[in-house]
Every structure is written in C-alpha cells, then in structure tokens.
UniProtKB/Swiss-Prot annotation:
Organism whose genome encodes this protein: Stenotrophomonas maltophilia (strain R551-3)
Keywords: Ribonucleoprotein, Ribosomal protein
Gene: rpsB
Protein name: Small ribosomal subunit protein uS2
Basic and acidic residues bias: start-end ranges: 258-267
One record GO biological process: translation
Length: 267
C-alpha cells in the first residue's frame, strides 16, 4: 500500500478545510477546530480513512478491475490526467458528460466516432477531402478528444471511481450510486461524507494536496496490478451494464440521507 505520512499531508495542506460558515455538520467528527474562520481537518482521522481507500483501490486493480479517475476542476485536471495515464486507468478531466455511466451505450457510440476520426487522419481518408471538410472533421475530433479521450479505451463500466471534489462532480457520483459503483472521494469540510463509499476528509482545492491524493491512488493501482494473478483473464463483455460484483466494497456505507451542502467556498 502507498505510504503517505501525516507530515506529508501537513506539508501538502490536506488539513485546511473551507470557511467555517460553509461547513457541513456531517463532517464534525473529522474537524479538529478552526483557525481564522477556516476549519482545520483532523489528520489523525484522515490517515486511517485514506489508507482504507487506497487499500480498496489496490484490491480493485488486483482483481483486474478498472478505476476511473475523475477531476474536472482546474486545480485537478493536469494531475488527474498524468496519474491516470501513469497507472493505465481511464480518466475524465475536462467536463463530466451527463449519462457517461447511466447511458454508457450511447457514450460508446461517441467514442467509436472519435476512433473513426482518428483513423481517418492517419489512413489517408482526410487527404481525399476538400480543405473545409477536413477542418470540420478535425474540430469534431478535437471536441470529442477533449471530453472522451480519457475513456476511449474503457470498454465497460468502471469497477470504482476515484473523485477529487464531490461537490464539483455531484452528477457523476449520483450516476455511480445509481449503478452501485463504489466511489472513493476526497471530501472537504463543506460536504457530506456519507454520500460516498470511501471518504477521505481533506482539502480538495490545494494543488499539492490533489497531487498527493492522485499520486497515491495511482501507486495503489500499480501495486494492485503487480499483485494480480497471472492466470488468463476472462473475456470482458463489450457493453457491460454493471461493474464486476467482486469489486464492490465488502462493507456497506451508512444510508445516504443527507444532501451535500452546495455553498461555494474558498479554502
């Protein structure tokens, strides 16, 4: 399991929450106190939950499952892409398209179109077209690449989702919960940790903190892959409608009754 110390979390600013006026009472057990109207997260509570989350990610990868890395806010985009690519997992870092999970068959059609356009660029098809047609096709390709490029090799629904900011990615989390896909997420002091299966109490804005979470998640994936049995894998169905059963968490999260506080805040 990736080793991240409390000192590393302190140096990355993981302990800085949002302004006290925006807090969610469900986060009370994880808050140490306040400093200058900013909540301070208790890292003694964060560390074990962080370790649980990383262990789960590793277990999914060990079973040859897929973990979708998700972070579309500006501070997370670059890191999410880099770390997902490093560990060979799909990602979305620009904009979540509604229905990406719940309407996955349609999304796959868009992915197929993206691959068709990419092939046309390399096999000489574009050379047979007039200039304005080529420009139009390239614009279409670039648009699809920006929104779907990170998941174009994801042939079935993911077995888990790793999320940086649950408020920013609330639609994705609702889709995942509807389909029973486990969610591992960083939860700041202004949101409800009960909305996800594996909550990591921590700063979801600071770039260094985002890098720490994402790097650890990628390391957990690589560790799980390294421990995976080398037996031949069973062929995956092209359009699976649900995640693998054995990748679901062993324990159930408490009932999700409270809605997340949608107040905007600056850490």
């Amino acid at each position: 399991m990736p080793q991240v110390t409390m000192r590393q979390m302190l140096e990355a600013g993981v302990h800085f929450g949002h302004q006290t006026r925006y807090w969610n009472p469900k986060m009370a057990p994880y808050i140490f106190g306040a400093r200058g109207k900013i909540h301070i997260i208790n890292l003694e509570k964060t560390v074990p939950l962080f370790n649980d989350a990383m262990n789960f990610i590793s277990s999914v990868a060990q079973k040859r499952g897929t973990v979708l890395f998700l972070g579309t806010k500006r501070s997370a985009r670059e890191t999410i892409k880099e770390e997902a690519e490093r560990c060979g997992m799909p990602f979305m870092n620009q904009r979540w398209l509604g229905g990406t999970l719940t309407n996955f068959r349609t999304v796959k059609q868009s992915v197929a179109r993206l691959k068709e356009l990419e092939a046309g660029e390399t096999d000489g098809t574009f050379e047979k077209l007039v200039k304005h047609e080529v420009l139009g096709l390239r614009r279409e390709r670039d648009k699809l690449e920006a929104s779907l490029g990170g998941i174009k090799d994801m042939n079935r629904l993911p077995d888990a989702i790793f999320v940086i900011d649950i408020g920013h990615e609330d639609i994705a989390i609702k889709e995942a919960k509807k389909l029973g896909i486990p969610v591992i997420a960083v939860v700041d002091t202004n949101y409800n940790p009960e909305l996800v299966d594996y909550a990591i109490p921590g700063n979801d804005d600071a770039i260094r903190a985002v890098q720490l979470y994402s790097r650890a998640a990628a390391d957990a994936v690589l560790e799980g892959k390294a421990a995976a049995p080398h037996a031949a894998t069973v062929r995956e169905e092209e359009f699976a409608d649900a995640p693998a059963e054995d990748a679901k968490p062993a324990r159930r999260a408490p009932a999700k009754k409270a809605a997340a506080d949608k107040g905007e805040a600056q850490a």
